[in-house]
Amino acid sequence: MSSLGGGSQDAGGSSSSSNTSSSSGSGQKAGGTDKSATVAATAPASVADDAPPPERRNKSGIISEPLNKSLRRSRPLSHYSSFGSSGGAGSMMGGESADKAAAAAASLLANGHDLAAAMAVDKSNPTSKHKSGAVASLLSKAERATELAAEGQLTLQQFAQSTEMLKRVVQEHLPLMSEAGAGLPDMEAVAGAEALNGQSDFPYLGAFPINPGLFIMTPAGVFLAESALHMAGLAEYPMQGELASAISSGKKKRKRCGMCAPCRRRINCEQCSSCRNRKTGHQICKFRKCEELKKKPSAALEKVMLPSGAAFRWFQ
């Protein structure tokens, strides 16, 4: 019995010891689990602090890393915003960062307003420059127009002066009314009738009482025919006056033209018969005689006055 009781006691002691050991073991395990829980609770904060920040990529997809090692723990602005932070410490840090972000945003807005104002000034300056350039171009065009008008007035004045001089020359060469039987009105009527009958090659001479046939055109120049002195008789007898002018021009003493090679010679040959008989014949050197003077008078001059008032041919 004693042995059985001792065995039971031993069994009870062992059981109690096992219970105590199990309880102590369970208590140690519980303490271990509590410590591991605290370590696990503190570990994520340290790991979160030591963990590298998330990769930042710009629009091109390039990773933007901080330039300095002290900036490795930097966080984006959204991390510190009121929407992203929920904890107490996180809320405090988020509040400070939010204040900084607000200050930065205010400075950026101020800079943006300054830039906008500068851009507005820059935009306004080109418009003002464009307006000033347009005004300058208009002024230059106006000055050019005034210059052209002044030049036109000057040319008109010169033309008027030339016409006045031509009228004076015509009045000096034409006979007076007292000496001639007819005056300027009769000659104007004749010139107008001729202009109506035939088209003249001198359209600008219609304003003056001059018939183009009065002008003798030679290579040496243009001369007035001698028939201008008999202008009075042309109104009454135009054909007779024409014939008289042709005869008188044929009898007129001719002069050297001064254009041909013999006229340009300045030295006599002293060998021809004219040079040998100079004292008796009073003839010019044969090598210096004008080519026009060698021709006959009838061939030298064409018809001076044409009945239709048309232009006459050049002398050949």
Swiss-Prot record:
Q: Which PROSITE patterns match?
A: ZF_CXXC
- Biased amino acid composition, Gly residues: 1-10
Q: Name one GO molecular function term.
A: methyl-CpG binding
Q: Does the keyword Zinc-finger apply?
A: yes
The protein's name: CXXC-type zinc finger protein 5
GO biological process terms, alphabetically, are:
negative regulation of transcription by RNA polymerase II; regulation of generation of precursor metabolites and energy
Compartment(s) where it occurs, according to its Swiss-Prot or TrEMBL record: Nucleus; Cytoplasm
ZnF (CXXC-type) residues: 250-291
The protein's matches in InterPro entries, at most eight in alphabetical order, are given as: CXXC4/CXXC5 (IPR040388), Znf_CXXC (IPR002857)
Positions bound to Zn(2+) 2? 269, 272, 275, 285
The domain-related comment in the record is:
The CXXC zinc finger mediates binding to CpG-DNA.
Motif (Nuclear localization signal) on chain: 251-256
* GO cellular component annotations of the record: cytoplasm; nucleus
Give the record's keywords alphabetically: Cytoplasm, DNA-binding, Metal-binding, Nucleus, Zinc, Zinc-finger
Q: What induces it?
A: Up-regulated by BMP4.
Could you confirm whether the keyword Transport appears in this record? no
Leader sequence range is none
Q: What is the lineage of its organism?
A: Eukaryota, Metazoa, Chordata, Craniata, Vertebrata
Question: Could you say which tissues express the protein in this record?
Answer: Expressed in neural stem cells (at protein level). Expressed in the dorsal telencephalon.
- Region annotated Disordered sits at 1-95
Q: How does it assemble?
A: Interacts with DVL1. Interacts with RBPJ.
The principal localisation class reads nucleus
> Domain of life, per the record?
Eukaryota
